[in-house]
Amino acid sequence: MVLSNVDAEEVNMDSSMELEESSQEPLRADNYEEIYNSLVHHEPDLEEAAHASYSWVVKNFSTLEDKTYSPLFKAGHTTWRIVLFPKGCNQTEYASVFLEYLPQCKVEAIRKYEAELAAGKTPTIDPEIVNDETYSCCAQFALSLSNVQDPTVMQINTSHHRFRSEVKDWGFTRFVDLRKIAVPTPEFPVPFLENDEICISVTVRVLQDPTGVLWHSFVNYNSKKETGYVGLKNQGATCYMNSLLQSLFFTNIFRKTVYKIPTDNDDSRDSVAYALQRVFYNLEKQREPVSTTELTRSFGWNSFDSFMQHDIQEFNRVLQDNLEKKMKGTEVENALNDIFVGKMKSYVKCIDVNYESSRVEDFWDIQLNVKGMDTLEDSFRDAIQVETLTGDNKYYAEGHGLQDAHKGIIFESLPNVLQLQLKRFDYDMLRDMMVKINDRHEFPLEIDLEPYLSETADKSESHVYVLHGVLVHGGDLHGGHYYALIKPEKDSNWFKFDDDRVTRATIKEVLEDNYGGEPAGRAKGYNGNPFKRFMNAYMLVYFRKSRLDHILSPVTAEDVPFHVRNTLDEEHRVVERKLLEREEQQIYRRVRVLTTDGFKKYHGFDMTDFSASDDDPVLITTKIKRNANIWDLQKHLAGLLNRDTSGIRIWLMTNRQNRTVRVDLPLDKKTILVDQICDMHIRKDMDMRVYVEFLSEHNQLLADFGATDDNDFDTYIFLKIFDYETQQISGLADLHVSKNSPISSLSEWIREHLKWSSDVPITYYEEIKTGMVDVLDPNASFEKSEIQVGDIICFEKKLVHDSSSDTSHPYKSALDLYDFMAHRVVITFEPRYSDDTNNGVFDLVLTTHTNYTDMARAVANKLNVDPNYLQFTMAHLPSRTPRSVIRNPSKFTLQNAIPSTYSHNQNVVMFYEVLDITLSELERKQLIRVHFLSNGISHETQMEFYVDKEGTVEDILRQVTQKVPLNAEDASRLRLYEVYNHRILKSHLPTDGIYDLNEFSTAYVEVTPKEEQMQLKTDDAVSIVVQHFFKDLSRLHDIPFYFVLLRGETLKDLKKRLQKRLGYNDTQFSKVKLAVLQAQSFGKPYYLTDDDEVLYGELEPQSHILGLDHPPANGSAQYHGMDQAIRMK
């Protein structure tokens, strides 16, 4: 026997599969049972529909044609045949063998073909061209070649495939070497091919495909068509966010609540609620995966943020907090609490005396242990287990002293939507590191949670919960992939939402595949893909069964805010139009048409702005078939313009080297094709741009100039006029002139046409390009002035009086207006901080010459504020994020804010702030940012304010007392210290100057603990720095702080005070190892293990630091404190 998994051009072989021999006897080609069992062993989890084996004895092998078919055979309700290429397929060195699945229509065609041949008739059908475009069939199979007389002389290859109309057969191009097929080998004394005959056998295992995607290539897969749902695009590392968003989207009551948040006047660039509404509506209506870029931009994230994976629980809370703030004062205030919030009671109850201390708190989700817990029920029992406090851990009960007590938590109420966070990441004490817990942890489709409620909880309604969402993580602590399994409706199937792809899912995929650990019932010796062990559930979403109809009530069009629906429907229509246009571009050429009438309506530079939208009144946008000729184009345009075809002339407009677009040549050859003209003169992807000259008006102009026909004229020009009163430049006429005539020859016609007196002086300019306009000599000829076809001449009535004092007319001549147009820039002004709700986003048209004073005055007029209170910050483009404050207003012009890549079609962003003090005062002030530690070191609040640059730390502390409600005694104990990279740089005295603060550090302000202040007044205490780290000193985290060492205090007693200062519970503090660190070096920590050790007198505050070695609260210690928490505007 030859056992082979040959790689063929058409095949991805299952190289891990091996056929096991049950005895010492060699495997036989006719031992179908053993071959079948080996197929099952390789894919034991797949559900079988049918299986069959079949052998085909091929006779006269050497005389066969290039392609030969076996008789048909059945496997259950499916029909198959073997396809043999005896001389090879796409090569000549190997025989090729394939397995083909036959849809019923093809089976019937083959039967009919064979019947007609048997009856001596000419076949009326070729069965090989008959096909069914809709079928698919999944199967494992083993194909073997063997000697007809000796089945042990064999070669066997195995594979699997999704048979479909695009790839109807599958097998092996290089099955057996034709040079060796008919000769004995060292392994086999007889050849495969003997007496010109050979046996080909197949065992096929037809498999169920309940999800429709088994072994799917996903080429041209359409989630909307196959499942009715669409996915979300991954921006780089946003799969964790996508899985949560899909879960929230299918929590219908949440989606309805989000839709009720008022966002009529919001901008999706900075409103999370509005951006989320848009994402949700797109998920309802789009046929393609939905982008989340707009949503993350509303968070204030840039592309770098989108490539960082975050904790899903933290992201969920930050998102909900943001929405809650937006809901305040609206009809949906507290609506999220009604959906997600339950109550739990933490208690300590004395055993021997009647005393209980308890606190009832809201929870948004429940964190449950996985390690050591076989089932979800075990995790709930673990969560509410009672801890007994005895011995050294007795509880101090006020009025009763130290008492034995029971400590624990119990649930008072559970929410309608219950989000369970499975603690898949935890600290491993033995390995001394954070690890992912891949233990098997089973969860049910339905669970009764009433046993975990307190005795006083309301149990009048059932607390049975139904599983509706499983969020899955695959990978380890350092990264991986996330997706969601969701049941969208009460009685629907389950679906897998994997970023932009949505597929149907089985119950096994929902439950068994995500329990983690080794799957139950795994066959002994199975050597399949071990990565599955690392794919497991990390968040479960249960809906209260009695409230299912409420939670999943259908979302209707009326639930969607009108402005969201209207705006996005229009955006979708625009997208559809663009798709249609792209399709039409293969047949049609878009044509932008400028006429004399349009030219007269235009007031900018050049002939017109061809980047304008299709509804621009200056231009006409139409289309013409690419194979149409110029005469067809002329008839088409004449009809659009309601003119006779003989009354118009078409001119092609092209790009000049100076980046202007001008009339170039007349399209007089009527038989030439539109595409031929375009290929010769314009770029392939560019619209065809034409100017339509009205000949009736042209003939009148000829008469006005005393000419008889066109031969008297050889230059075609365009006239513009600058009107001093309206402060506009406008198109006036298109003229044919003689190149030998002087420029002044235009004057008589102009005066007559505009009814000016004959003595009005006229000044002429040539509009060459942006920023270049030349004065023309009226006595020079058109030829000498280098005026050619398509050139633009602008003229004006020369002012005869001094207009310098006329402020209502800033442009004194055409040159002034041309200069403005050349340096014109649109600035988009945005509030520097998103919480500035009093002011909005607006555009102003200014010039690159605009200085700071003029810009401030223009913005102040718009905002109705004093310009002296405005401060501006330039922006990064294209991210539209703040870059740097304008520090030197006296030297600033808008040119400083314009990037070199700026084009006149884009807006430049500038951020503004309305200050509480004037800008001049601000120059004497310094912005101070501090973090106030309000509850020990466990809570911090960031605040900002200005203080005098010459001020002191006392000024900072005074500002803090104005922002935080403190009594006089606490205010007197405030202290400020600086931290950099989680190390204390310096503790400041109130008299220290502001200039002493390091601009790169973080300033922390706290109320010095009263007992610490009292202790330090004695000789029995010393203050020392405490610093957090994880395993080594390059991995610092959390906020360092000051702590007091007491004379004679043992390490055991110190730990109790330290735990209280940190605010850690027993579980958290059990992970902390105390160590002595060298203050001025990165030497190895000296770990403290003797509880009787006394640190006072052993540690010097200037030389030592008390180190706390433990994993950070967020589960990911970063080097040098570079970890970034999730932030949203």
From Swiss-Prot:
Residues 51-204 form the MATH domain. The active site is at 239 (nucleophile), 481 (proton acceptor). It is found in: Nucleus. Residues 1-26 are annotated as: Disordered. Disruption phenotype: Decreases cleavage of the sde2 propeptide; simultaneous knockout of ubp5 abolishes cleavage. Simultaneous knockout of ubp5 leads to abnormal splicing of introns featuring long spacing between the branchpoint and 3'-splice site. Simultaneous knockout of ubp5 leads to a growth defect and thermal stress sensitivity. The keyword Endoplasmic reticulum does not apply. GO terms for molecular function: cysteine-type deubiquitinase activity; deubiquitinase activity; endopeptidase activity; metal-dependent deubiquitinase activity. Its main location: nucleus. Pfam families: UCH, USP7_C2, USP7_ICP0_bdg. Its EC number is 3.4.19.12. InterPro entries: MATH/TRAF_dom, Papain-like_cys_pep_sf, Peptidase_C19, Peptidase_C19_UCH, TRAF-like, USP7_ICP0-binding_dom, USP_C, USP_CS. GO terms for cellular component: cytoplasm; cytosol; nucleus. Keywords: Hydrolase, Nucleus, Protease, Thiol protease, Ubl conjugation pathway. Hydrolase that deubiquitinates target proteins. Cleaves the UBL propeptide in sde2. Involved in regulating the steady-state levels of proteins including prp4. Belongs to the peptidase C19 family. This is Ubiquitin carboxyl-terminal hydrolase 15. The lineage of its organism: Eukaryota, Fungi, Dikarya, Ascomycota, Taphrinomycotina. The gene is ubp15.
